[in-house]
Amino acid sequence: MASLSDSLVRQLLEGRYIASLATKNPDGSTHMVAVWYWFDGAHIYIATSTRTRKARNLQSNPKISLMIDSRDPAASCGVNIVGTAQILTGEPSRKWNGRVHAKYLSDAALADPRVGPVFASWDDVTIQIAPTSVIAWDMREADRQVFGSAFASNPTYLLPLER
């Protein structure tokens, strides 16, 4: 099992990737969505709206799963995080949501009245995740250990992903 301080985990948590967040629907099925996030070294923050299914699901069940991966076949790596979520409101929410938005949107987008203020008003709460389990994987390491570097020495073995 990995930890939040592992270099690969920190690279993924501090980088600009799209995460997949899973929550439980009232009927027990899984609700999974793509999200932007911010990592402060201990918690993960996701800007969202009280109107979203994920926020409503977390009101009754705070357990989450989060996956962040590189989406690069030649250097596939990722982290799976299980944790407990808390919904932040008010000033703490505005602070964290601002950091999430600034991580993914350019200064020009944030200043554009059609973009920045819309995100700020739509995302009225923040999901704060306290990780309880962290598991990381690195296909480059698996290639060296299991496949004798077959993929590294033959880049055409892995087909490109759709964009």
Language-model features, listed with the residues they occupy:
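Charged, gly/pro-rich active-site loop segments
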Residues: 3-4, 77-163
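Alpha-helix boundary recognition
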Residues: 13-14, 59-60, 120
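A generic local structural motif
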Residues: 5-8, 31-33, 51-53, 113-115
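Residues that act as N-cap/strand-start positions at coil-to-secondary-structure junctions
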Residues: 15, 31, 121-123
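Short, basic/aromatic recognition patches
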Residues: 1-20
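A short beta-turn/loop motif at secondary-structure boundaries
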Residues: 27-29, 72-74, 117-121
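Short, surface-exposed beta-strand-loop junctions and turns on beta-sheet-rich folds
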Residues: 52-54, 73, 143-144
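Short beta-strand segments
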Residues: 17-50, 56-58, 64-69, 77-80
